[in-house]
UniProtKB/Swiss-Prot annotation:
<feature type="topological domain" description="Cytoplasmic">
    <location>
        <begin position="258"/>
        <end position="289"/>
    </location>
</feature>
<dbReference type="GO" id="GO:0009986">
    <property type="term" value="C:cell surface"/>
</dbReference>
<dbReference type="GO" id="GO:0042110">
    <property type="term" value="P:T cell activation"/>
</dbReference>
<dbReference type="InterPro" id="IPR036179">
    <property type="entry name" value="Ig-like_dom_sf"/>
</dbReference>
<dbReference type="GO" id="GO:0006955">
    <property type="term" value="P:immune response"/>
</dbReference>
<keyword id="KW-1015">Disulfide bond</keyword>
<feature type="transmembrane region" description="Helical">
    <location>
        <begin position="237"/>
        <end position="257"/>
    </location>
</feature>
<feature type="signal peptide">
    <location>
        <begin position="1"/>
        <end position="18"/>
    </location>
</feature>
<feature type="domain" description="Ig-like C2-type">
    <location>
        <begin position="136"/>
        <end position="210"/>
    </location>
</feature>
<comment type="function">
    <text>May play a role in the immune response.</text>
</comment>
<keyword id="KW-0812">Transmembrane</keyword>
<feature type="glycosylation site" description="N-linked (GlcNAc...) asparagine">
    <location>
        <position position="208"/>
    </location>
</feature>
<keyword id="KW-1133">Transmembrane helix</keyword>
<dbReference type="InterPro" id="IPR015631">
    <property type="entry name" value="CD2/SLAM_rcpt"/>
</dbReference>
<keyword id="KW-0393">Immunoglobulin domain</keyword>
<feature type="domain" description="Ig-like V-type">
    <location>
        <begin position="27"/>
        <end position="114"/>
    </location>
</feature>
<dbReference type="InterPro" id="IPR007110">
    <property type="entry name" value="Ig-like_dom"/>
</dbReference>
Length: 289
């Protein structure tokens, strides 16, 4: 029974919209971050009185009927997926979506029905949800051929990368830099060639991450080195050494503080005994009867 008044309201809104003039306000690309919030701004002419606002995405999302003379607006969220996830910001009732998921990507539109001019405006948004990228992972495929020549391919990837990813490689020599587009880098080496290092860079519209530099010398010297995932090993080794150094500094600091306390305690006790002795000597002795 509670749903019947809302159903009647929607039917009346649809019937009234058939006699209106329509005005298209364009489409807007909106970049959003996974598990964060986004607001879809809605522009309403200041001299117009709004009859209602209908938000939709794939299907009806919510209907907003502004209140009159200080009364609150009537808001009905019609899509269960957005219950507790959306709110509407005064004074234009822009749509605010919190805790974004991949499913929230896609087209959204706002239909604003104006009471005074009998005109309906339509504004569209395309939400693209992305996530912050983690450190790139490198896969190495190593092959050796005759006459001491070697070839190697490096494949760069990011876990749960999502859409619109781009990859590039930076090859660095003694005094040269070379850029390569794409996630796969193929290279070769012959005796006498100078050693290079390779860095993968991964990008999406909201973040930019790079791998640790990978030297090619260990690969050509030892083909089994390719199975050790050097970029991850180097990064873990550097982080481990840094943590170990911090722990050593912390332990030395605690030891110094403890030694200082040990030296201070006998002095404090001796000082307290001297004070007590002086106080006793300062008191007048009892005279004999």
């Amino acid at each position: 029974m509670c749903a019947f008044p809302w159903l009647l309201l929607l039917l009346l809104l649809q019937e009234g919209s058939q006699r209106r003039l329509w005005r298209w306000c364009g489409s807007e690309e909106v970049v959003a971050v996974l598990q964060e919030s986004i607001s879809l701004p809605l522009e309403i002419p200041p001299d117009e009185e709004v009859e209602n606002i209908i938000w939709s995405s794939h299907k009806s999302l919510a209907t907003v009927v502004p209140g009159k003379e200080g009364h609150p607006a009537t808001i009905m969220v019609t899509n269960p997926h957005y219950q507790g996830q959306v709110s509407f910001l005064d004074p234009s009732y822009s749509l605010h979506i919190s805790n974004l998921s991949w499913e929230d990507s896609g087209l959204y539109q706002a239909q604003v029905n104006l009471r005074t001019s009998q005109i309906s405006t339509m504004q569209q948004y395309n939400i693209c949800v992305y996530r912050w990228l983690s450190e790139p992972q490198i896969t190495v495929n190593f092959e050796s051929s005759g006459e001491g020549a070697c070839s190697m391919s490096l494949v760069c990837s990011v876990e749960k990368a999502g859409m619109d990813m781009t990859y590039s490689w930076l090859s660095r020599g003694d005094s040269t830099y070379t850029f390569h587009e794409g996630p796969v880098l193929s290279t070769s080496w012959r005796p006498g060639d100078s050693a290079l290092s390779y860095t993968c860079r991964a990008n999406n519209p909201i973040s930019n991450v790079s791998s640790c530099p990978i030297p090619d010398g260990p690969f050509y010297a030892d083909p089994n080195y390719a199975s050790e995932k050097p970029s991850t090993a180097f990064c873990l080794l550097a982080k481990g050494l840094l943590i170990f150094l911090l722990l050593v500094i912390l332990a030395m600091g605690l030891w110094v503080i403890r030694v200082q306390k040990r030296h201070k305690m006998p002095r404090m006790k001796k000082l307290m005994r001297n004070r007590m002795k002086l106080r006793k000597e300062a008191k007048p002795g009892s005279s004999p009867a």
